[in-house]
């Protein structure tokens, strides 16, 4: 049974690494695909593998209804393409890298989605943000404040601790994705 699995969490929580690890650990025959995001950020900016679009390209796609989900965050526009609907109609579960701020809209569009909040203790979040080298100290503090203030509530919300070793946590996420896909249950 196909499901939309909506991964979200604060910057630095390890979503990209965790999703990449889970993707590697899912068997090739598993009926699961990982959607890429369309972002108005250069492709070489670091972080996830995404489709880089100019603002004009993004707006054109948005105006033509080519995004299943879209939102703005940290000065960039993000979109998940309508192709996810085709994938789910064909029986595949789809994993997306979403946004806490866009969860409400995602639930309206896909009421049966499984929301997964990636969580790590603040000291680990601070460490990871510093290690990636994209933000200065002030920007890191601002992200930590946003992470503390963000309240994520949703039916069936799964809080997923990502403070352990990547291989272990990736295997656990792959297990959650596969269990959700096979059972058709939200959690």
Swiss-Prot record:
Keyword Nucleotide-binding: yes
GO molecular function annotations of the record: ATP binding; ribose 1,5-bisphosphate phosphokinase activity
Binding, ATP: 9-16
Keyword annotations: ATP-binding, Nucleotide-binding, Transferase
Keyword Nucleotide-binding on entry: yes
Top class in the EC scheme: transferase
Enzyme Commission number, as recorded: 2.7.4.23
Biological processes per GO annotation: 5-phosphoribose 1-diphosphate biosynthetic process; organic phosphonate metabolic process
Biological pathway: Metabolic intermediate biosynthesis; 5-phospho-alpha-D-ribose 1-diphosphate biosynthesis; 5-phospho-alpha-D-ribose 1-diphosphate from D-ribose 5-phosphate (route II): step 3/3
Organism superkingdom: Bacteria
Catalytic reaction(s) noted: alpha-D-ribose 1,5-bisphosphate + ATP = 5-phospho-alpha-D-ribose 1-diphosphate + ADP
Alphabetized InterPro entries for the sequence: GK/Ca_channel_bsu, P-loop_NTPase, PhnN
HAMAP family: PhnN
Family: Belongs to the ribose 1,5-bisphosphokinase family.
Role noted for this protein: Catalyzes the phosphorylation of ribose 1,5-bisphosphate to 5-phospho-D-ribosyl alpha-1-diphosphate (PRPP).
Protein name as catalogued: Ribose 1,5-bisphosphate phosphokinase PhnN
Organism: Desulfomicrobium baculatum (strain DSM 4028 / VKM B-1378 / X) (Desulfovibrio baculatus)
């Amino acid at each position: 049974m196909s499901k939309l699995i909506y991964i979200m969490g604060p910057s630095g929580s390890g979503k990209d690494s965790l999703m990449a690890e889970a993707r590697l650990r899912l068997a090739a025959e598993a009926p699961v695909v990982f959607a890429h995001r369309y972002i108005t950020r250069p492709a070489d900016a670091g972080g996830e593998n995404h489709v880089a679009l100019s603002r004009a390209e993004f707006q054109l796609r948005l105006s033509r209804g080519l995004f299943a989900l879209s939102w703005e965050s940290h000065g960039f526009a993000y979109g998940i393409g309508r192709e996810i609907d085709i994938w789910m109609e064909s029986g595949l579960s789809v994993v997306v890298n979403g946004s806490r701020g866009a969860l409400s809209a995602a639930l309206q569009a896909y009421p049966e989605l499984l929301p997964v909040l990636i969580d790590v203790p603040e000291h680990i979040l601070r460490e990871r943000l510093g290690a990636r080298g994209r933000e200065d100290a002030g920007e890191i503090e601002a992200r930590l404040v946003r992470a503390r203030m963000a309240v994520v509530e949703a039916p069936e919300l799964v809080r997923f601790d990502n403070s352990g070793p990547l291989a272990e946590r990736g295997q656990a996420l792959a297990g959650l994705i596969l269990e959700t896909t096979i059972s058709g249950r939200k959690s």
